[in-house]
Design a protein with these regions (language model features):
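A structural signal for conserved, well-ordered secondary-structure elements
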Residues: 1-719
Length: 719
C-alpha cells in the first residue's frame, strides 16, 4: 500500500469515527422519555409500569383482542405518549408505560373495564355499551352517488326497544355517545329507529368511521382480563441505572484500550481505534433499528466489547507467530489475518447461536440482552476483520514498520496440561460437589435448592431505599413487622441489597390495594421516598413458563452448538468434549448461585448462555489450533503424538486465552463495581463464569478430547 493511499484510508476512518462519535453523543445526550432522537429505554432504565394480562375467556377472537388492545392504548395514551400495548401469544396483552409517577393509580385504572354510554341531550344515560351487539365501519354511496363513510350499529333486543323509544321522542336532536367520560360522537336523530339497526353518518374517512366503530364495540366487550405479571420501577432508580452503567462502560473501555496498547503496541493502537468505532456503531444501530435498551442489554453491549477484543487478540497472536518464523511484518500481517479467520468465525457463530436461542425462547429483558449481544457479535466481526485490518495496514504504510512495534512470539516449552488432567478433573469435581451439597442442604432447610426469584417462583417483590445502612437485625425488627401487618403473611423474606441502603421484601402475591398499602406504610413509618420504590408481581403461571423456557434455552443452544462443531471439525469427539465442558461451566455457575445465594431470576438464563457462548468461543480457538497441528502430523497418531499436539496447542494459545479473559473480565468488573444492584447480581456470576470458562477451555475441554480420542471411536489412537 502506498503512503498516500494509506493516509487517505486512515483519514477516512478517523473522519468516519468522528462523525459516528458526534452522532452517538447526540443520541446518548437525547436518550430519555419523549426525546425524538433517542434510544428507547426499557422500564428498568426509564422507570414506569409494565403489566401483563391473561384473557379469562377461552379462545378469544382476533377482533376482540384487537378491540381490547385499542381500548387499553387509548387509556394509556393519557399517561404517556411513549406508552405501548401489544399482544403476546394468543391470549395475553402487555402494557408498558415509561416515565410515570403514580404507578399504582395507573394499575388500578387499567383494571377497570371502561364504559360506553348513549346519553340524552340533558346528559342522562339511556343505554350502555352492553346493549350494542356489533358496530362496523363501512363505505356506501348516497342517492347522488357520492361516497360516504358510516358506522353501522346492531343492537340487542333490549337495546333496540330502548333505542326505538328514545329516537322517536328526540327527532332532530343530538344524542351524545360517551366513552370513559369523553364524547366520541354527537349524532343527530334523523328519524325513529325501531328495527334494532342504525347508521351514524358524517365521517370524513373510512379510518375515522372504523375507529369510532371500534370504540363503540369496546364498550360492549365482555372480555375479562386477569393480571399475570406487573412491574413498577421508580424513575429515580432508572436514572441511576443508566448513568452508572454508561460510566462503567466508558471506564472499562478506556482500561481495555490502555491494556491493548501496552500489550500489543501498534496493533493495540489499531485495535483501540477499532473498539471506539465498534462502540459508536452499536449505539447508532440501537437507534436506527429502534431497539429498546435494558439493563441486561447494556451488559450485552459491554460483553460485546470483550468479544471484539478477543477477535483482535487472536489476529495479533497469529501475526507475532509469523514474525517469529522469520517472515516480514507485512507478510505476517496478511497471513495472520488469514489464519485467524476460521477460529474467529467459528467462535463467534457459536456465540451467535446462544443469542438467537435467547431471542427465540427468552422474553422481556432477556430478549433485550440477546438483541444487543447479537448486534455486538456482528459488529465485532466487522471491526476486527475489516476496520482493524485497514488501520493496521495504513499505519505500516505510513512508516511504522519496525518489527519491535509488532512483537515476536517467544518459543515456549510445551506445558504438560494433559499430564495434569486428573488434578483438573478432581478440582472441578470438588467445586461441583460443593454446589450440589449446598443445594441439598438448602433444599432440606428452606424448601428450595436455589434462591429462586419471583421469575421462577411467583409472588410480589418490593425494593425500597431506606436512606441508611441497616443490619439484618434492624430489618427484622423495624421493617418486617410492618410488612407482616399489611400482608398478613408470616413468611416474609427481607434481604439487604449489598453495597446500597436498599432492602428487598418478598411476599406472597399481593393485590393492587395491598401493594399500595405497603408502599404507603413504608413511606409513613420508615421515611422511604416513594419514588425509590420498585415492585414486581409474577403469577405462578408466568414463573412456571420461565423455568421451562430457561431449561429449553440451555438444551436447545447446546444441541445446535454440538451440531455446528461436529459439522465444522468433522469429528464428534471435538463436539462432545466441548459440550461436556459447557455442562461443567453451567454446573459451576449454578454452584456460585447456590453458595452465594444470588437470586435466580430472569437474567439467570442470560448469564448462563453468555458464559456458554464465551466458553465455547475460547474452546474453539484451542480446537482450531489442534486441528491445524493434527494436519501437520501425517500418518496414524499414537497416544503420545496426541498428547504432544494437545499440549503444544494449549501452550500456543495460552497467552491469547489469558489476555482475552483479562479484557472481558475488566468490562464485567466495571459493571460490578459501578452498576446498580440488579446489574451486580448479573455481573458476579458472570465474573465467576468467565474465570470458569477460561479454566474449562484450557484444563477440561482439551483433556476430555484427548481421553475420547485415545479410547473411543473408529480412529482412536494407538497406545
Amino acid at each position: 500500500m502506498k503512503k498516500s493511499k494509506a493516509a487517505v484510508i486512515l483519514a477516512v476512518i478517523i473522519a468516519a469515527f468522528a462523525g459516528l462519535a458526534y452522532y452517538a453523543s447526540i443520541i446518548l445526550s437525547s436518550t430519555g422519555i419523549g426525546e425524538d432522537m433517542s434510544i428507547p429505554l426499557g422500564l428498568d432504565l426509564s422507570g414506569g409500569v409494565s403489566i401483563t394480562y391473561q384473557v379469562v375467556d377461552e379462545n378469544p377472537s382476533a377482533e376482540d383482542m384487537s378491540d381490547t388492545i385499542y381500548k387499553l392504548q387509548k387509556r394509556v395514551d393519557s399517561y404517556s405518549t411513549e406508552a405501548s400495548v401489544y399482544q403476546v401469544g394468543d391470549d395475553r396483552i402487555t402494557v408498558e408505560i415509561p416515565g410515570v409517577q403514580d404507578a399504582n393509580e395507573i394499575l388500578e385504572d387499567l383494571g377497570n373495564p371502561g364504559s360506553l354510554e348513549f346519553q340524552m341531550p340533558d346528559g342522562s344515560v339511556f343505554m350502555t355499551g352492553d346493549m350494542v351487539e356489533d358496530a362496523q365501519g363501512a363505505t356506501t354511496t348516497d342517492r347522488y352517488g357520492n361516497k360516504q363513510y358510516i358506522v353501522s350499529l346492531k343492537l340487542t333486543d333490549e337495546g333496540a326497544k330502548i333505542f326505538g323509544e328514545v329516537t322517536s321522542e328526540n327527532i332532530g336532536k343530538n344524542l351524545p355517545i360517551v366513552y370513559d367520560g369523553e364524547t366520541i360522537s354527537y349524532p343527530r336523530v334523523q328519524s325513529a329507529i325501531t328495527g334494532g339497526e342504525a347508521q351514524i353518518t358524517g365521517m370524513s374517512s373510512f379510518e375515522e368511521a372504523d375507529n369510532l366503530a371500534t370504540q363503540i364495540r369496546i364498550g360492549s366487550l365482555s372480555l375479562q382480563l386477569t393480571e399475570l405479571e406487573s412491574s413498577v420501577v421508580g424513575a429515580q432508580l432508572g436514572s441511576q441505572a443508566i448513568s452508572s452503567s454508561l460510566k462503567a462502560g466508558a471506564i472499562g473501555l478506556a482500561v481495555v484500550m490502555v491494556f491493548m496498547i501496552v500489550m500489543y503496541a501498534v496493533p493495540g493502537i489499531a485495535a483501540s481505534l477499532a473498539l471506539a468505532i465498534y462502540t459508536t456503531l452499536v449505539i447508532a444501530t440501537l437507534y436506527l433499528f429502534d431497539i429498546t435498551l435494558t439493563l441486561p442489554g447494556i451488559a450485552g453491549i459491554i460483553l460485546g466489547i470483550g468479544m471484539a477484543v478477543d477477535a483482535n487478540v487472536i489476529v495479533f497472536a497469529r501475526i507475532r507467530e509469523e514474525i517469529a518464523t522469520g517472515k516480514s511484518v507485512q507478510t505476517s500481517m496478511k497471513i495472520g489475518f488469514q489464519k485467524a479467520m476460521s477460529a474467529i468465525l467459528d467462535g463467534n457463530i457459536t456465540t451467535l447461536i446462544a443469542s438467537v436461542v435467547l431471542m427465540a425462547l427468552g422474553s422481556g429483558t432477556v430478549k433485550g440482552f440477546a438483541y444487543t449481544l447479537m448486534i455486538g457479535i456482528i459488529l465485532s466481526l466487522f471491526t476486527a476483520m475489516v476496520v482493524t485490518r485497514y488501520i493496521l495496514y495504513s499505519l505500516y504504510a505510513l512508516g511504522l514498520k519496525s518489527e519491535k512495534l509488532y512483537g515476536r512470539a517467544k518459543e515456549r516449552k510445551s506445558i504438560d496440561f494433559i499430564g495434569k488432567k486428573a488434578v483438573f478433573f478432581t478440582i472441578s469435581g470438588i467445586i461441583i460437589a460443593a454446589g450440589l451439597i449446598s443445594m441439598g442442604v438448602h433444599s432440606a432447610t428452606e424448601g428450595k435448592a436455589l434462591n429462586y426469584g419471583l421469575d421462577f417462583m411467583g409472588g410480589t417483590s418490593t425494593t425500597a431505599d431506606f436512606g441508611k445502612d441497616m443490619t439484618i437485625e434492624d430489618i427484622e425488627n423495624d421493617i418486617v413487622p410492618y410488612v407482616e401487618k399489611v400482608t398478613g403473611d408470616s413468611d416474609v423474606q427481607a434481604t439487604k441489597v449489598e453495597g446500597t441502603t436498599q432492602v428487598t421484601i418478598k411476599t406472597r402475591t399481593l393485590s393492587l390495594d395491598e401493594r399500595q398499602e405497603l408502599e404507603d406504610t413504608l413511606a409513613e413509618n420508615c421515611d422511604v421516598d416513594a419514588s425509590t420504590i420498585t415492585s414486581q408481581s409474577i403469577s405462578s403461571t408466568i414463573s412456571g413458563e420461565m423455568r421451562s423456557d430457561a431449561l429449553k434455552a440451555v438444551i436447545v443452544s447446546c444441541i445446535f452448538m454440538l451440531l455446528y462443531i461436529w459439522f465444522r471439525f468433522k469429528d464428534i469427539r471435538f463436539a462432545a468434549s466441548a459440550i461436556l465442558a459447557l455442562v461443567h461451566d453451567v454446573l459451576v455457575v449454578i454452584t456460585v448461585y447456590a453458595l452465594v445465594r444470588i437470586s435466580v431470576g430472569s437474567t439467570f438464563i442470560a448469564c448462563v448462555l453468555t458464559i456458554v457462548g464465551y466458553s465455547i468461543n475460547d474452546t474453539i480457538v484451542i480446537f482450531d489450533r489442534i486441528r491445524e497441528n493434527l494436519a501437520l502430523k501425517t500418518g496414524k497418531q499414537t497416544a503420545e503424538d496426541l498428547r504432544e499436539i494437545a499440549n503444544k496447542s494449549l501452550t500456543q494459545t495460552l497467552s491469547r486465552s489469558i489476555n482475552t479473559s483479562i479484557t472481558t473480565f475488566i468490562m464485567v468488573v466495571m459493571l460490578y463495581i459501578l452498576g446498580v444492584a440488579s446489574i451486580r447480581d448479573f455481573s458476579l456470576p458472570l465474573m465467576a463464569g468467565l474465570v470458569c470458562g477460561a479454566y474449562s477451555s484450557i484444563c477440561i475441554a482439551t483433556e476430555l478430547w484427548y481421553v475420547m480420542k485415545v479410547h473411543f471411536g473408529k480412529n482412536k489412537a494407538t497406545k
